[in-house]
Amino acid sequence: MERDKGVAPIVVENVAYNEQVVSFVRNLTSSFFGCAAGILGLTSYEGLALYVLGYFFVSFLLFALKMRGNLTKYYQPGYKFWIAKILDGAPSYVLTWTLFYSLVYVYE
């Protein structure tokens, strides 16, 4: 019935899988950004800014390259992709940020 009207059905399992994959990519890249912040010696708001910029950069790359600009095909509400899980990668980021900062700058 939905296909007759030209509307693609939304399958909940597919949307949940897409969210899981995006969450995995963001968590993995947040660790890499944490390593970069630690090696660069960023502290305080500079490190926080790198996390936020990195989060949105990775989100934009996923949106542009993998989704080809068609967000509604993979997610129901559009805002959820951009800001809903911004804090999920923060623990990984902070852990690797402090680890690499202490490894590089321990003798200063």
From Swiss-Prot:
Q: What is any one GO biological process for this UniProt entry?
A: autophagosome assembly
Any Gene Ontology CC annotation = endoplasmic reticulum
Mode of membrane association: Multi-pass membrane protein
Q: Where in the cell is it found?
A: Endoplasmic reticulum membrane
The superkingdom of the source organism is: Eukaryota
Sorted keywords for this record are: Endoplasmic reticulum, Membrane, Transmembrane, Transmembrane helix
InterPro entries referenced in this protein's UniProt entry, alphabetically: Emc6 (IPR008504), EMC6-like (IPR029008)
Q: Where are the transmembrane segments?
A: 21-41, 45-65, 86-106
The family line of this record is:
Belongs to the EMC6 family.
Identification of the protein by name? ER membrane protein complex subunit 6
